[in-house]
Amino acid sequence: IEQLGEGKEAIQAIGDIPYINKKWLDCLGLEIPTTVDELEQVLIAFRDNADKIQEECGVEGDVIPMSFITNNGDQDPAILINGFGEGYGDTGDHFAVTDEGEVIYTAVQEGYKEGIQWLHHLVEEDLVDPEAFTQEWSTYVAKGKNHRYGLCFTWDIANIDNYDDYVMLPALAGPDGLVNITRQNNSETSGFDRGRCVLTTSCRNTALAAAWIDQMYAPLQSVQNNWGTYGEEDKPNIFELSENAEGGTMLKHEDLGDNSPVEVREAQSVNGPLAVLNDYYDVYVTQPDDAKWRLDNMHETYLDDMNSKYVYPNVFMSIEDTNKVSQYDTDIKKYAEQMKASWILNGGIEEEWDEYLQKMEDYGLSDYLAIKQKYFDQYQASLGEQ
């Protein structure tokens, strides 16, 4: 569990935040776009004024109006299409829940189709990084560090470029004026995750192992499992050992300077079982500056447009249903994401849509949705019993 805010205010509510280059906007005398049409015009301006941007904004290499990594979690551009059709866009796992409590698959909705058509139009206009469909994280970051992006997508812009030049792009009104942010599924359970640690039958001393696992939930240990540690020489550290206002031991986040927060964290954190609760902050650990920056800006930019009542929760399924879902996810998600990338890059969604829907059914989408619906209903019923 990693808590930082709750409900719609949880830091996990949005993963793939679009960051637009405010330095470039100012250079060209442009306002932050608020509609999909305005964004397209801004991207065109970035493309058509590449020489001016390169000269005045310190760009190393060709100007790239928009870049992303297709089907790559927080680096995917799906948040841009939330204003199309029904307003669900496309979540990371492709599920959403209507305000009536119906579980749907985002990648078979009409609004999704319209949004993908629009993204392909941006490709046709030469506004999208040609490598967006094949690049690895390291390539994506390297181009960002050379200040080449007008618009990019990630959890924290400091992982790609810097805080000074970028602002969060607000939720865009679609063709009919609809504005919505579809929150990430599981986000209301504060990063709750299952399977961080497993005791197998081959464990020779289960009592000792269980006692060791229990220590992973000690506050000072959990925050290190989650973020990283302190005192390592000749390398960036996440923390320094400090004291809270009461004189107790507290881990204080270090200033990482030009180091990427995610790269330092990945080098030091061990993950595994952990719990970081809201009431730990300023008692056992400081709130990290990058997370506070993200959370404050996320609330200011997106909170009012998080219109959906539900997200799909983190649920425990029977072994039988878990196995079924695993197989469905392999077939259905793989096919959906393969076609999504193809349609954004090459077009053809209108002509291939009916065949696509039929193939999704052949893969078992209706049964997949029925299983997900059953556990959503059980979860909602359990809330009423509390």
For the regions a protein language model found, what residue spans apply to each?
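Helix-loop-helix "hinge/cap" segment bordering the ligand-binding cleft or interdomain interface
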Residues: 1-75, 97-143, 199-232, 351
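Ligand-binding "clamshell"
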Residues: 160-184
